Design a protein with these regions (language model features):
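Acidic/His- and Gly-rich active-site-bordering loop/insert found
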Residues: 2-102, 111-127
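Histidine/acidic-residue-rich, glycine-tolerant segments that coordinate divalent metal ions
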Residues: 62, 83-84, 90-101, 108, ...
Length: 189
């Protein structure tokens, strides 16, 4: 089992890289299944960390951490696609692509997934079971997960449980708070 203190210590060192990934993705938003730059960034980062990323479906990416000790397989999912709307934020890292922007946080989700991948790789020998990382396209058009499911997302290794996350911008919550609703949740996206 990975000690929380070790994870936090490593996580604190990743902040500059997370900001860099997020801002790069934010400047170059891509929509639907048409994510060549985003997918290339994800696969390059994963490869540099020591993963062997695998394509899944039209544009999804998978990577495995752990697997050296017995245990369950947990899927960790993050989405990568942007929205077909014009950004008017004026931020220094605003979209450079007319009519497209990361207005729903998927740039952050992708950066956070890469951060999780880095943490997991650095503590891989401590993982009981396997963590399957899913970088999903086309969430905004409700097609990305369906495509990945049809192309073996939940197999090899078989997934026992899945977790996804989403930022809640504008919510009156303190920084660092995580909300986890009770009970089972299921989704098609």
């Amino acid at each position: 089992m990975i000690a929380p203190e070790k994870l936090l210590e490593t996580a604190r060192t990743l902040e500059p890289r997370l900001v860099e990934w997020r801002r790069t993705l934010h400047r170059h938003p891509e929509v639907g299944f048409d994510l060549p730059e985003t997918k290339a960034l994800v696969k390059k980062a994963l490869t540099e960390m020591g993963y062997t990323p695998q394509d899944c479906g039209k544009c999804g990416v998978l990577a495995l951490a752990g697997g050296k000790k017995p245990g369950k397989t947990i899927l960790l999912r993050g989405d990568m696609d942007a929205l077909p709307i014009q950004e008017e934020s004026g931020e220094e890292f605003a979209s450079e692509v007319p009519g497209r922007m990361h207005g729903c946080g998927h740039d952050m989700h992708t950066a956070m997934m890469l951060g999780a991948a880095k943490l997991l790789k650095e503590h891989e020998d401590e993982i009981e079971g396997t963590i399957k990382l899913e970088f999903q396209p086309a969430e905004e058009i409700f097609q990305g997960s369906l495509d990945m499911l049809k192309n073996g997302l939940l197999e090899a290794p078989k997934v026992d449980a899945a977790v996804m996350f989403h930022v809640l911008a504008g919510m009156p919550l303190p920084a660092g708070m995580v909300l986890v609703p009770g009970g089972d949740r299921k989704s098609v996206v």
